[in-house]
């Protein structure tokens, strides 16, 4: 990719994008400009990755073809309003702020701007993220492909229509927390059975990771994969019976429904 890439803000998620992009070799460090309000942080990123340290958000906006706005949602609109006059005509702005809609972004930047709303999740920090990419009507297929390729440097990415953002929050953005709870609960049970805790976490986490990989790589329905493990009269079907009796599926569905409702409510506030 020959385009210049800019970052305004570079917290954990911004750094995950930056690191994944450089590691992929898609762009050279010299093609990247980063600005954060902390000079020490920018200097550290320069030392670690060899990127260009910008002196202002406006400098990033003037130079970069693709600008990742990676600041907190509460200040996103203010930051974008301050750079809009510095953007080039064909600049593409990618927001990774949860809850900030395309319309809100366009009101800050101008309705003639190319904007993408993206939502990566925290496994991006270990190169296993899942990112939704939602372009506005002005974004070209080439622009979208460039952004998808960037997010695929540290996981998977898919184009999602904006009304589907709330299900994305439930099934991807927030779901690592549910999975961590499941891993913790399984490990607690293993500890109860006598296994050392560190070993219990490793067994539980590897089982979850391996199971997810089977879903993705085999293309089999999760229910069919579950049935493969459940021998007649065996230990696994006994565990499944208890989970069903305790409302495991219903609890997950209800929790995600509430998560989606909260996401929709927050986007309107």
From Swiss-Prot:
InterPro entries: 6-PGluconate_DH-like_C_sf (IPR008927), NAD(P)-bd_dom_sf (IPR036291), P5C_Rdtase_cat_N (IPR028939), P5CR-like_CS (IPR053790), P5CR_dimer (IPR029036), Pyrroline-COOH_reductase (IPR000304). Pathway: Amino-acid biosynthesis; L-proline biosynthesis; L-proline from L-glutamate 5-semialdehyde: step 1/1. Gene3D superfamilies: NAD(P)-binding Rossmann-like Domain, ProC C-terminal domain-like. It catalyses: L-proline + NADP(+) = (S)-1-pyrroline-5-carboxylate + NADPH + 2 H(+); L-proline + NAD(+) = (S)-1-pyrroline-5-carboxylate + NADH + 2 H(+). Inhibited by p-chloromercuribenzoate. GO terms for cellular component: cytosol. Keywords: Amino-acid biosynthesis, Cytoplasm, NADP, Oxidoreductase, Proline biosynthesis. It is an enzyme of class 1 (oxidoreductase). Its EC number is 1.5.1.2. The keyword Ribonucleoprotein does not apply. One of its GO terms (molecular function) is identical protein binding. SUPFAM superfamilies: 6-phosphogluconate dehydrogenase C-terminal domain-like (SSF48179), NAD(P)-binding Rossmann-fold domains (SSF51735). Pfam families: F420_oxidored, P5CR_dimer. GO terms for biological process: L-proline biosynthetic process. It is found in: Cytoplasm. Belongs to the pyrroline-5-carboxylate reductase family. Can use either NADPH or NADH, but the activity observed with NADPH is severalfold greater. NCBIfam families: proC (TIGR00112). Catalyzes the reduction of 1-pyrroline-5-carboxylate (PCA) to L-proline. Does not catalyze the reverse reaction. This is Pyrroline-5-carboxylate reductase. It comes from Escherichia coli (strain K12). The gene is proC.
